[in-house]
Amino acid sequence: MEMLPNQTIYINNLNEKIKKEELKKSLYAIFSQFGQILDIVALKTLKMRGQAFVIFKEIGSASNALRTMQGFPFYDKPMQIAYSKSDSDIVAKIKGTFKERPKKVKPPKPAPGTDEKKDKKKKPSSAENSNPNAQTEQPPNQILFLTNLPEETNEMMLSMLFNQFPGFKEVRLVPNRHDIAFVEFTTELQSNAAKEALQGFKITPTHAMKITFAKK
């Protein structure tokens, strides 16, 4: 029997070797593009290994995430996604703290986020001044240049985003610079397809990735 759409999606067939904190960060990175995430639950108990729950604020966000990310290769294993059996019942049983106020527990979070929003307004203004020119000036290249990446970005996270595109070769991070990276493809056509698809992809709610062709 199919589950009715709700804010919580259930994911299984996850790689059991990934540490819990890294798993949660990576899930957040690929699912935050669909809408505000209230919580991610991933436990390493024997019964719950290879499974996780992502709780969105809106049902529409959960529906888009389920439809778009079904079968997405995540740490070399295709994700299997379904709606949770009921809005938060399973999560409540797992966490033991989620039952009474599943949606009221999280709303205080926007308060500290107000500073981030101010930063968000400042940062794009400086980035946008230089980037549009870069995008028009650089001719096609099989190597892409990524900017505006958040501090928690790592090679595995970017590889998961880009390896779904044909011709993906490698991700190259820049030492002592968390905000930029290079991604190489076999041909310029392949790199352009990835560039068009992931332009503006939100790795976190405050960081929309900017992609240009690298200088030749």
UniProtKB/Swiss-Prot annotation:
Q: What is the effect of changing residue 49 to H?
A: In allele SNF1621; sterile
Renumbered to this chain, region (Disordered) spans: 97-142
Q: Which species expresses this protein natively?
A: Drosophila melanogaster
Put simply, this protein is called U1 small nuclear ribonucleoprotein A
Location of the RRM domain: 7-86, 142-216
What GO CC terms are in its UniProt record?
catalytic step 2 spliceosome; nucleus; precatalytic spliceosome; protein-containing complex; ribonucleoprotein complex; small nuclear ribonucleoprotein complex; spliceosomal complex; U1 snRNP
Role played: Binds stem loop II of U1 snRNA. It is the first snRNP to interact with pre-mRNA. This interaction is required for the subsequent binding of U2 snRNP and the U4/U6/U5 tri-snRNP. Plays a role in regulating sex-lethal splicing.
> Which positions are tagged coiled coil?
none
Subunit composition and interactions: Belongs to the spliceosome where it is associated with snRNP U1. Interacts with the SMN complex.
